[in-house]
Regions:
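Conserved beta-strand in the GNAT
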Residues: 61-63, 69-78, 85, 90
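Conserved GNAT-fold acetyl-CoA-binding loop/helix
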Residues: 22-50
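A short helix-loop-beta-strand connector motif used in the catalytic cores of GNAT acetyltransferases and
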Residues: 43-63, 72
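A short, internal acetyl-CoA/4′-phosphopantetheine-binding micro-motif in the GNAT/acyltransferase core
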Residues: 89-96, 122-124
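A short beta-loop-alpha structural element at the N-terminal edge
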Residues: 5-19
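Conserved catalytic-core motifs of GNAT/GCN5-like acyltransferases
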Residues: 121-125, 130, 134-156
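Conserved GNAT acetyl-CoA-binding A-motif
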Residues: 111-124
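Conserved acetyl-CoA-binding loop-helix of GNAT-fold acetyltransferases
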Residues: 91, 97-110, 135
Length: 164
């Protein structure tokens, strides 16, 4: 098993992170009519990009490393003093299904031990993600946003609550 570490990313690492993100999301593009993931308007997509995340005070961009090789990334946003949302989470396809994602999410919990509630969202078409978050990572589906024809998707909203 590789050693998983997290490092806060710098803006000059953006291009490398975007390449990994693109490959990671391409794996699921077959579930969407236009092959675009996430299936939102251009404005919403722009607001959720890695580049935009570097500009937000309440968000931190991370690189995920397996044995010192960058294999993924995430954007963690502070919601309240004890609640955070993982706005983006992605791994290189070569690392998916090998325990790296589960261990990376555990590393985020260790990085922010004061966080009592973790949230994340994934499209309803990507059931593999939902199964992973629920069965492997201990998240619970707390809401299902209905299918939106304009966005071509519904969304699962997950939470994981910790006792501190």
């Amino acid at each position: 098993m590789p050693v998983i570490t997290l490092k806060r990313s710098k803006k000059d690492e953006l291009t490398h992170l975007e390449h990994i993100e693109e490959a990671a999301f391409a794996v699921n593009s077959r579930y969407f009519e236009n092959g675009v993931l996430p299936p939102f308007s251009e404005e919403e997509r722009t607001a959720c990009t890695l580049a935009a995340s570097f500009e937000r005070d309440v968000a931190a961009v991370f690189s995920i490393y397996a044995d010192n090789e960058r294999v993924g990334g995430a954007v963690v946003q502070l919601l309240t003093h004890d609640e955070r949302e993982i706005v983006l989470f992605f791994l290189a396809p070569s690392c998916q299904g090998k325990g790296v994602g589960q261990r990376a999410l555990n590393a985020f919990e260790a990085e922010f031990p004061e966080t009592k509630v973790w949230r994340l969202i994934t499209p309803t078409q990507v059931l593999r993600n939902a199964v992973f978050y629920v069965n492997k990572c201990g998240y619970h589906i707390v809401q299902i946003d209905a299918y939106d024809k304009e966005k071509e998707s519904g969304m699962f909203i997950f939470e994981k609550r910790k006792e501190i």
